[in-house]
């Protein structure tokens, strides 16, 4: 890594430590030319697959869109933000684990419903009613009956 002070090419690592619960590495480095010390952080760059919408439009995966959809369903429900973040991370892990460059938006919707079902049944019904375009109260009842099985 180049020295940020003298721009020399050669630096050495003096110390490395895991930070952020093991998700990144903090390194102390020293320039071999000017002897200045500096800190770097190393994080794995994980590429998410692109999303193929139902109309065949392709767009980059948008974590914020995923989060806002889940939070809308979970509004005023007793679910912690930590639990929501864990669910989002689980969905992202499942998407990466497919190994595909593109995934259908329907797959993401199904993964969201799976996580919401575990977090909060009311939020699950809210999300499912919009996602599956429930037309009447009968469809709500059928979905609730499936939950009780």
Swiss-Prot record:
InterPro entries referenced in this protein's UniProt entry, alphabetically: ATP-cone_dom, NrdR-like_N, RNR_NrdR-like
Keyword Metal-binding among record annotations: yes
Keyword Metal-binding: yes
GO process terms (BP): negative regulation of DNA-templated transcription
Cofactor binding note from Swiss-Prot or TrEMBL: Binds 1 zinc ion.
Span of domain ATP-cone: 49-139
Named cofactor requirement(s): Zn(2+)
Function according to Swiss-Prot or TrEMBL: Negatively regulates transcription of bacterial ribonucleotide reductase nrd genes and operons by binding to NrdR-boxes.
Similarity annotation: Belongs to the NrdR family.
Full protein name: Transcriptional repressor NrdR
Lineage, uppermost ranks: Bacteria, Pseudomonadati, Pseudomonadota, Gammaproteobacteria, Enterobacterales
């Amino acid at each position: 890594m180049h020295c940020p002070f003298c721009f020399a090419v050669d630096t050495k690592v003096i110390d490395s430590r895991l930070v952020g619960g093991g998700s990144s590495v903090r390194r102390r480095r020293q320039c071999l030319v000017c002897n200045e010390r500096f800190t770097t952080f190393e994080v794995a760059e994980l590429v998410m697959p692109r999303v193929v919408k139902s109309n065949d439009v392709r767009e980059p995966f948008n974590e914020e869109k995923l989060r806002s959809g889940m939070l809308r369903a979970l509004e005023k429900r007793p679910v912690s933000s930590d639990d929501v973040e864990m669910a989002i991370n689980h969905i992202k892990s499942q998407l990466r684990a497919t190994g595909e460059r593109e995934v259908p938006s329907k797959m993401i919707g199904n993964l969201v419903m799976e996580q919401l079902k575990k977090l909060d049944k009311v939020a699950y019904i809210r999300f499912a009613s919009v996602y599956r375009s429930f037309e009447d109260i009968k469809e709500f009842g059928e979905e609730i009956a499936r939950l009780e099985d």
